[in-house]
Amino acid sequence: MTTFLGKHSEADDHIAQLRWLGHDVRVVSGGHDKEGVLDAFATGLELPDWFGRNWDALVDALRDLDARHGVPIELVWDHAATLREQDRRAYDTVVEILEQVADERDDLYVTVITR
């Protein structure tokens, strides 16, 4: 499941509520182009060294993302507005990847915040 929040939503409250519910909240911040967003995911999710910084590698890394403590993972992609405005194709690709992997996994939920 993917939740989309805009710049006028209570994004910080949403993240706090997910933490309160006991979800394993992992925040990825920003990215203004393909390279930047792949770097943001690598850093924000502490992806392994084999992560090749391409779309296929992102899919593989998200599929392999370990759930800590057996609780659901809530992947929050925050500050996604810049990529959406500067490179809509890359933004759409990231959203498609996130939705695809979330559909494949029972323990992964996604929030995209475009602020």
Stretch-by-stretch model annotation:
Residues 1-115:
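Positively charged, polar, low-complexity stretches
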